[in-house]
Amino acid sequence: MQVKAEARYIRVSPQKARLVVDLIRGQQAGKALTTLRTTNKRIAPTVEKVLQSAIANATNRNENVDVDQLFVTEAYVNEGPRMKRVRPAPMGRAYRYQRRLAHIVIKVTEKEA
């Protein structure tokens, strides 16, 4: 049984979020939580919340699920919409820049013993 959790419109560059998500793909859920707690990146606590949500979704859907047998089968980051912003520049001009948003998706599956 595959269970999904996602966080949408997270204010982080998808490229930076992928660095953290790539660390936990394929890991056992408990080990992935430990990895995220020790990772020194700004997005790591957010990814940890998404993973905890996926684990909670699995236990809510099926009370017989063994949390120790849950594995991260899919974890990916998609690009969200971009917020366009303006920075004041010299001589009355303005420079445009974009703030990137990300959608984080984590799927966990119970591995058969």
From Swiss-Prot:
Assigned GO CC terms: cytosolic large ribosomal subunit
Keyword Isomerase carried by entry: no
Molecular function as annotated in GO: rRNA binding; structural constituent of ribosome
Keywords on record: Ribonucleoprotein, Ribosomal protein, RNA-binding, rRNA-binding
Record has NADP as a keyword: no
Gene3D superfamilies from the UniProt entry: Ribosomal protein L22/L17
Cleavable signal peptide: none
Transmembrane residue ranges: none
Matching Pfam families: Ribosomal_L22
GO biological process: translation
PANTHER family (alphabetical): CHLOROPLAST 50S RIBOSOMAL PROTEIN L22-RELATED, LARGE RIBOSOMAL SUBUNIT PROTEIN UL22M
Stated family: Belongs to the universal ribosomal protein uL22 family.
Function as written in the Swiss-Prot or TrEMBL entry: This protein binds specifically to 23S rRNA; its binding is stimulated by other ribosomal proteins, e.g. L4, L17, and L20. It is important during the early stages of 50S assembly. It makes multiple contacts with different domains of the 23S rRNA in the assembled 50S subunit and ribosome. The globular domain of the protein is located near the polypeptide exit tunnel on the outside of the subunit, while an extended beta-hairpin is found that lines the wall of the exit tunnel in the center of the 70S ribosome.
Subunit comment: Part of the 50S ribosomal subunit.
Protein name: Large ribosomal subunit protein uL22
Species this chain originates from: Solibacter usitatus (strain Ellin6076)
Gene field: rplV
